[in-house]
Amino acid sequence: MPGEKNFFQTFGEAFAKGDIFTKVSFLVWGLGYIGHGQLMKALLVTLVEGLGLYFLAFYGAPNLAKFGTLGTVKMEMVFDVTTMKNVVNNYDNSFEILLMSMISFVVIAALIAAAMMVVTSNYQLQKIRAAGKKTNNFLQDIKVYLNEKFYVTLLTLPVLGVVVFTIVPLFILIAVAFTNYDQQHMPPNDLFTWVGLTNFFTLFGGGGMTSTFGYSFAKVLTWTLVWAFFATFTTFFGGILLAMFINDKKTKCPKLWRTLFMVTIAVPQFVTLLLVRNFFSNNGIFNTMMANAGVTDFLHNIGLLDKGLSYIPFLTQPGWAMFTIIMINIWIGVPYQMLISTGVLMNIPADMIEAARIDGANPVQMFFRIKLPYLLSVQGPSLVTDFVRNVNNFNVIYLLTQDVFVTNNQQLAQSNAKEIDLLVTWLFRLTQEYYNYKMAAVLGIMVFIVCAVFTVVCFHFINKKEATFS
């Protein structure tokens, strides 16, 4: 990448052409600044370097030494001859070793990057002094970072947040996928260790338990993609149509209608989805209404409902549950999309609409030739985001089907999956109910790959089309 190349080239030039103070600052950050008359900077960078080295010496090194095995000493009770009591031995905690090792790797990378920046900074000071110019003092440097380089100040905390709450957990997730961390290997009572690609073979290979996970992954991935597609585009087009109807000049009280549809967004999903689950249960009010209206008998007659059922299994049979979930998601998602579409439709250039009307275009032609392309060009990135969000849409699936849907598919059941599971709900169930962290980590990687590939491909095509309405 150009940015990385420029950074390393700048460091290489600084280290090659720098004086002794510049070169030595790579190892002892403060010495370079002392040599170039920057005492406050020297104190601050020495403090930062000292904290980093302290962490590595007392927390990083002991755990990195055990990183290859993730521990060898199990927790057990031993007899202490001093106290004449049974006490817990000095055992290894595999997860603590893994966690601290990953943090240590990040700290090491950060220290190296910081050392390179210190060398580059010292080289700049060296050149300023060689030119006979005066270098900034500490207060002047602070003013620079509050003015010309204020963007650096603003980005510091967000970058730290990304490292701590995104990069480190991601590294741990990837690492766990290569271990046997599950219910039989739970720290601190037991140890887990590295198993290489075994978990990936379990997911994609064949034979025994492997075949059930491979079968389940294919089924769950297929439903996840089908769900994400319909959940995204039904709400997208539904929101557009609803926005057009409400904003039409013939519609009475548009503000009232817009407010009524907003209720589904205003009420938390945790409340609405649990209520809806009760409405659509086998003995719920909706089934009672369908039976009284003769719909249940009609479905029996046309073969869409098994003769032995006296109710419509909205949330208890795979096909019905998938259809019902998508319909409920339309009810939840269309009002939100309506608001976005309303804003976009109001910003379509009036001259485009007027030109089309003069050319004799009817409303349908104007929608497909002007409004829809404009909406797609503006909301393209939002559609990609919505698709990824729906791939990870935990609430709708889990709250509607948990404790209601029971699978009869034994292969799915053996791998703790259900027909209506998304990858993310399957992952959640593996961790929270069955403590199968190793396979959950593999699924987490698969979710990331699916979302990343889709996002990259979509943005590639979006960038090609973005100039159409510019």
Label for each model-derived stretch:
Residues L27-W29, F79-V87, T202, G206-G207:
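Pore-loop/selectivity-filter region of tetrameric P-loop cation channels
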